[in-house]
């Protein structure tokens, strides 16, 4: 049964939650540790600004690049703090823009870096 780590960060911007479990994608056969790592106030502030400005930002915006790097670091810390081997990480990243009526959504988070620094392949870009 695949060992997985699920990561969650929401628009509350309070931090990243992580949970380890064994599942085939339909049935959970074992639950492991879980944790929350709160974002520092500066990252929380910067993410709020990005949420407010997202519709006018470009991918190369320095504020966005900086926030994405810091946000990814929190996700890496969460995976490593669980101290459990995993075969897969569920990583939806941080939503900064969601306009379903316009078929538009944007998440930030560096899945390639998450894979490199944890040694575990993430399932990303789920939207």
Task: Give residue spans per PLM region.
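Short acidic/glycine-rich loops and adjacent helix/strand connectors
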Residues: 1-127
């Amino acid at each position: 049964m695949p060992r997985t780590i699920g990561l969650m960060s929401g628009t509350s911007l309070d931090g990243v939650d992580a949970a380890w479990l064994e599942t085939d994608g339909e049935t959970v056969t074992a639950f492991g540790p879980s944790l929350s790592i709160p974002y520092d106030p500066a990252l929380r502030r910067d993410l709020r600004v990005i949420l407010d400005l997202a519709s006018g930002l470009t991918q190369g915006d320095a504020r966005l690049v900086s926030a994405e790097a810091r946000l990814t670091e929190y996700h890496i810390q969460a995976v490593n703090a669980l101290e459990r081997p995993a075969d897969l990480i569920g990583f939806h990243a941080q939503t900064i823009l969601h306009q379903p009526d316009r078929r538009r959504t944007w998440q930030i988070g560096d899945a390639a870096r998450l894979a490199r620094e944890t040694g575990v392949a993430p399932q990303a870009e789920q939207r």
